[in-house]
Amino acid sequence: MQQPHIPVMLNEMLKFLAPKAGESYLDCTFGAGGYSKALLENCDCYVTALDRDPNVIKKAEEIKHNYKDRFDFVETNFGNCFAKLESKKFDGIVLDLGVSSMQLDIPDRGFSFLHDGPLDMRMSGQGLSAEEFINTAEEKDLADVIYKYGDETFSRRIAKKIVEVRKAARIDSTGKLADIVRSCIGFRKGKIDPATKTFQAIRIYINNELGELEQFLANVKNILKKDGRLVVVSFHSLEDRIVKNFFKENSEKPVARSKYAKEDIMLNPDKWLKIITNKAEIPSDKEISLNVRARSAKLRAAKKI
């Protein structure tokens, strides 16, 4: 049974994006449409949404039916969206990184360790599947991926077990992979499922999620209007580090001309952002209690100067 989709940190997203009537916004990760719909309901603005998952098109068509020319949908991954956007510029851009609740709740997509299904994990349905990777990768490569993208302490033990098991029979379902991981770690009461980190790591690797994020950030300046805002919600320490470092490297620096002068802004042509979140915003305890998927979320925002 699918759980209702609850957009993560929705109020914070609206606060920092600060939508206004007549302005245009880019929702880079449409998913179930929570952010797009909230923006459209907030004021008389325009939203363009992106997603590489063909399964979300029906939801996009529903929003298009309700909001007509105020909403457009483009089937593409956000890392390669620039040509398809045809030189459009936006007053605000939002990214909600990671997997959507819809993808997690459909067993056939192969994202969830809670539901047995084909071991797929591809957001677009194209390219290398998790099953192919799990059954063909070298033990060292498996361990490296699980450690790097999952922060999994037991990565080598898990990789070794995967190689042992696949010699006897192909690992072709999420249930089989989850059981292998659990057998290596074991359950601890009150802790997250032992398979969480491994599934996250494989999903990030299969979909090149970090590479796509870096590619988008490298080009986002070209589609963000002056004073436009960029809001990013991440769910993994590596994602957050990429966003944090990008904001820092491209932000204006306050510089005091002398110890007697007031602090002044020295603008460098290479510095085009002003950070508007002093530190990463995190969900409230209330939101986490209502939506456990929000527990690891972090939101950062900046403005183009």
Swiss-Prot record:
- Write the Enzyme Commission number(s) for this entry: 2.1.1.199
Q: Which reaction does it catalyse?
A: cytidine(1402) in 16S rRNA + S-adenosyl-L-methionine = N(4)-methylcytidine(1402) in 16S rRNA + S-adenosyl-L-homocysteine + H(+)
Q: What class of enzyme is it?
A: transferase
**UniProt-annotated location(s):** Cytoplasm
Q: Which GO terms describe its cellular component?
A: cytoplasm
Residues noted as binding S-adenosyl-L-methionine in the record, renumbered to the chain? G33, G34, Y35, D51, F78, D96, Q103
Q: Which GO terms describe its molecular function?
A: rRNA (cytosine-N4-)-methyltransferase activity
Which keywords describe this protein according to UniProt? Cytoplasm, Methyltransferase, rRNA processing, S-adenosyl-L-methionine, Transferase
> What's a single GO BP term from this record?
rRNA base methylation
Q: What Pfam families has UniProt attached to this entry? A: Methyltransf_5
UniProt KW Cell wall biogenesis/degradation keyword: no
Q: Does the keyword Methyltransferase apply?
A: yes
Q: Which InterPro entries match?
A: RsmH, SAM-dep_MeTrfase_MraW_recog, SAM-dependent_MTases_sf
Of which family is this protein a member?
Belongs to the methyltransferase superfamily. RsmH family.
Looking up PANTHER family in the UniProt record yields: 12S RRNA N4-METHYLCYTIDINE METHYLTRANSFERASE, S-ADENOSYL-METHYLTRANSFERASE MRAW
Q: What does this protein do?
A: Specifically methylates the N4 position of cytidine in position 1402 (C1402) of 16S rRNA.
Q: Which NCBIfam families match?
A: 16S rRNA (cytosine(1402)-N(4))-methyltransferase RsmH
Q: What's the name of the protein?
A: Ribosomal RNA small subunit methyltransferase H
Q: What is the lineage of its organism?
A: Bacteria, Pseudomonadati, Pseudomonadota, Alphaproteobacteria, Rickettsiales
Which gene produces this protein?
Answer: rsmH
